[in-house]
Amino acid sequence: YPGVTNNICAPIIAKESKFNLNEGFYLGYSPERINPGDNKHSLDKIIKVISGSNNKITKIIGKIYETIITAGVFYAKSIEVAETAKAIENAQRDINIAFVNEVSLLCQKLNISVYDVLNAAKTKWNFLPFQPGLVGGHCIGVDPYYLAHIAKKLNSSSDVILSGRRLNDSMTGIVFKKIQKQIKKRSRLLQIGVTF
């Protein structure tokens, strides 16, 4: 979460190494942004956000990444800016999926297809095309809690972030109940998993 690198990692490294930050050691932070299985957005084709504990180390980190990242490098103003950017990228995705999940539940009650609704809505140029379903990956379901943690620490609101997370957490049970209704007694079931 925002502040971990400077407020947690740096003091531990300083204590264990007996060096001072930006004298005996430096810090850099660059969030992972790849999407496993996505060949279109491979490591070299995604803009790399980088940051460092001072301008000198940030430039060094940038030069290293510029040798492998064809999409370019974005120099964040600070490590905290880069950390927060990573957390909100994932929280935003989580919230958008929660919104579409909520719309899906409403469409069920309206006896209309959520996919018909989404197909109609995506004809507008600025509509964001998210699909209802479960949230996967190791970051999407966790980063909203990191943001909520730091928000609580700083006496700031995280109501929208946590609301989306609660809805998405409940979707596993909702999907399971839906499957149970569809399965008749003594039905044969083939379970196939897809993950990354």
Per-region residue spans from a language model:
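Structural/interface elements that position substrates and couple domains in central-metabolism enzymes
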Residues: 1-196
